Amino acid sequence: MLFLSFHAGSWESWCCCCLIPADRPWDRGQHWQLEMADTRSVHETRFEAAVKVIQSLPKNGSFQPTNEMMLKFYSFYKQATEGPCKLSRPGFWDPIGRYKWDAWSSLGDMTKEEAMSAYVEEMKKIIETMPMTEKVEELLRVIGPFYEIVEDKKSGRSSDITSDLDNVLTSTPNAKTVNGKAESSDSGAESEEEEAQEEVKGAEQSDNDKKMMKKSADHKNLEVIVTNGYDKDGFVQDIQNDIHASSSLNGRSTEEVKPIEENLGQTGKSAVCIHQDINDDHVEDVAGIQHLTSDSDSEVYCDSMEQFGQEESLDSFTSNNGPFQYYLGGHSSQPVENSGFCEDVQVPPGNGNIGNMQVVAVEGKGEVKHGGEDGRNNSGAPHREKRGGESDEFSNVRRGRGHRMQYLSEGTKGRQVGSGGDGERWGSDRGSRGSLNEQIALVLMRLQEDMQNVLQRLQKLETLTALQAKSSTTTLQTTPQPTSQRPSWWPFEMSPGVLTFAIIWPFIARWLVYLYYQRRRRKLN
């Protein structure tokens, strides 16, 4: 005798009580039947819970299943409760019944257990979108956890990543900042897979960087030595004004500008030295190879894409290598000798005959500063001057605008104005304001010309479209309209002749057939 009692619940909650008489041994067939009963009870329990959830859905609730979804549930429900479809298909007057019959009959000979499990599987797909109710909670409790746990098989890969991160953290990165942007170069951390030549190059580069840093620590003053009889006080005041103006444009702060020397005895000429300490926010690359520019640093409207690559004029005064000196001497035969300087540039005298100008820059690769510029041309590359008496022209015309170094005479009190384009001038206030106004005027003129060109093109397009419209209308009017064969009072769409032919042709065909048979009879007679 076998007695089974089941309770609805999850896989762990149902219990089975077996009462087996002592005189009967345990049969394998009974054991298989018990297992089938257990599995069937689980499918039935889950199916009943899912059906209760579907039946408890409100008509105007937040979750509204689609028609296709309801057809699936209907077909699985009918297959699980009644088996395969054996009914005839409804008539054309019942389209909903026909759809239901098609969905049910498409399951074929699916067993009830398979239909129940399919019903539950479809319910699992949408159970997360349903509102949490008592029926849904019961279904979740019956189903149990149905999420799959995916094992992480990328442990080796993650260990490689962590080792790479450890190598990066333990290395000594050499950060270089140019124009307020950070540029990191990890010269101390080479991987094991790199070649020996790259390691040697990295070691040599680090040694060169250390040497240059030592040199930069020695040079902390910015000396601008001006000779050839310029007014000392006026020059100092102008330079201070220019430094404050340029630093305010760039958003940088100048901590102090003070004279550190007032007398340099050389051939009875006066000299002025300016000491300037700039914050560490602006540090140039020691090697002078890589230069980063910032489009937001420009305060002047750039008319062309050529001006976007220009550097700022104040960069030349705040290089990482330390100070630079620029001399205005009266004799070209007096060279400037200094081991820290890289190149000398001799500029031929202009109309003012101020003599030779020697510009010397302390830059990693020997960059030359012209009139307060930072040694870069229009495209951002550094100027390279030749020693063999050759010198690059200081005039570079960009789309009709002057871009040149001006040679000023001793009578005038102005100084050289650096190359424009980035909105900063190392020169007098009047010169910078004048050049800025000229650039604004040129930009406005170009804008007006462009607007006029656009307006002219629009007018041409409007006239062309108007002419095309007129020509199309005239061609339509000149083309002869097909005369309608039907009168205005005719109610039918077809013409009267067509209608008459449609009515008469059967009689004509009948008459022709009659004539044929009549002739045939005459021949027979």
UniProtKB/Swiss-Prot annotation:
Residues 158-177 have a biased composition (Polar residues). The keyword Transport applies. This is Acyl-CoA-binding domain-containing protein 5. Keywords: Acetylation, Autophagy, Coiled coil, Lipid-binding, Membrane, Peroxisome, Phosphoprotein, Transmembrane, Transmembrane helix, Transport. The lineage of its organism: Eukaryota, Metazoa, Chordata, Craniata, Vertebrata. It is found in: Peroxisome membrane. The modification Phosphoserine is found at S184, S185, S187, S191, S206, S270, S304, S419. GO terms for biological process: fatty acid metabolic process; pexophagy. One of its GO terms (molecular function) is fatty-acyl-CoA binding.
